[in-house]
């Protein structure tokens, strides 16, 4: 009986890993054993940073909103509080896009937030 080898599967597995290691430097690019560990590490970082990206964008939106709200005489936290009291349900991404691309519209929203805050203080 002929000895069964896994050569086709092994070759395709090695090829896949070496293809993923394209662009790596030195032995990490062409030697399977080092490529495999480098690719695994790269994939771990990739997974981790995909999760981090969500928080990074949220921080960016908050920074943009903070700057835009200070132009209208509000801090970021007072802007968000005023929007909640005014019943305006816009998320931070949409608000930051509005602050950049539609400053007049953002000014209207900020004014409504300010009025809601003043109404809460008086009443």
Swiss-Prot record:
GO terms for molecular function: rRNA binding; structural constituent of ribosome. It holds the Pfam family Ribosomal_L20. Gene3D superfamilies: 6.10.160.10, Ribosomal protein L20. The gene is rplT. It comes from the Bacteria. Binds directly to 23S ribosomal RNA and is necessary for the in vitro assembly process of the 50S ribosomal subunit. It is not involved in the protein synthesizing functions of that subunit. The keyword NAD does not apply. Belongs to the bacterial ribosomal protein bL20 family. CDD domains: Ribosomal_L20. One of its GO terms (cellular component) is cytosolic large ribosomal subunit. GO terms for biological process: ribosomal large subunit assembly; translation. Keywords: Ribonucleoprotein, Ribosomal protein, RNA-binding, rRNA-binding. This is Large ribosomal subunit protein bL20.
């Amino acid at each position: 009986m002929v000895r069964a080898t896994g050569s086709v599967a092994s070759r395709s597995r090695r090829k896949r890993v070496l293809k993923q290691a394209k662009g790596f430097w030195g032995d990490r690019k062409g030697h399977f054993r080092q490529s495999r560990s480098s690719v695994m590490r790269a994939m771990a970082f990739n997974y981790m940073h995909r999760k981090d990206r969500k928080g990074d964008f949220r921080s960016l939106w908050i920074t943009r909103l903070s700057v835009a709200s200070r132009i209208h005489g509000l801090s970021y936290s007072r802007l968000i509080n005023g929007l909640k009291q005014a019943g305006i349900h816009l998320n931070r991404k949409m608000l930051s896009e509005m602050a950049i691309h539609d400053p007049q519209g953002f000014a209207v929203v900020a004014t409504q937030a300010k009025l809601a805050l003043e109404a809460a203080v008086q009443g």
